[in-house]
């Protein structure tokens, strides 16, 4: 799962993602949470958009699986992602920024108006999150994520021997 998320993180910067199959649904970032109860200092002066995000957009019906891409950060609980009232999945519980790739089953999109909802789960735990840069790719998730490959080798400069290591890839 993490490998798929990592590939999705790189995806938004790739030229392949900007193809005709790619539709930006919302380019803005939205702070979601409970008003008056900021979880982090950075949200003290930034009131939340609300406890959920409702986004309406026009699209074509999807005869095959498509992929919903959502940039997210500071997620500590499983926020639900719904399309036209149907649950697609949950945001990844991870505080680091990432792009989540959720499969959109065939027939889930309607021709014309559609509604995407990201809503907090019923929980007493505070969870201020940031979501945005939401896009829809008409290709199945496997195809979308298959566009990106990374080949990294870490070797000793003198001997050329492979070195054990841990890498963190970021999009900044």
What is the role of each PLM region?
Residues 4-13:
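Bacterial N-terminal signal peptides
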Residues 18-158:
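Beta-strand-rich recognition domains
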Residues 158-172:
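Short, ordered, surface-exposed loop/turn motifs in non-cytosolic proteins
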């Amino acid at each position: 799962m993490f490998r798929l998320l990592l590939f999705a993180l790189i995806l938004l910067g790739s030229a392949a993602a900007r193809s005709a199959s790619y539709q930006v649904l919302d380019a803005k970032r939205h702070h979601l949470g409970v008003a008056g109860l900021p979880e982090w200092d950075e949200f003290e002066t930034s009131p939340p958009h609300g406890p959920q995000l409702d986004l309406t957009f026009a699209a074509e019906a999807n005869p095959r699986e498509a992929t919903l891409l959502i940039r997210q950060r500071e997620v500590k609980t499983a926020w639900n992602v719904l399309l036209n009232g149907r649950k697609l999945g949950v945001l990844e519980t991870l505080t680091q920024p990432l792009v989540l790739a959720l499969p959109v089953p065939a027939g889930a999109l309607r021709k014309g108006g559609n509604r995407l909802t990201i809503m907090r789960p019923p929980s007493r735990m505070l969870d201020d999150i940031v979501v945005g840069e939401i896009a829809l790719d008409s290709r199945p998730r496997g195809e979308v994520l298959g566009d990106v490959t990374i080949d990294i080798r870490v070797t000793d400069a003198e001997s050329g021997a492979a070195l054990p290591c841990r890498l963190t890839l970021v999009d900044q």
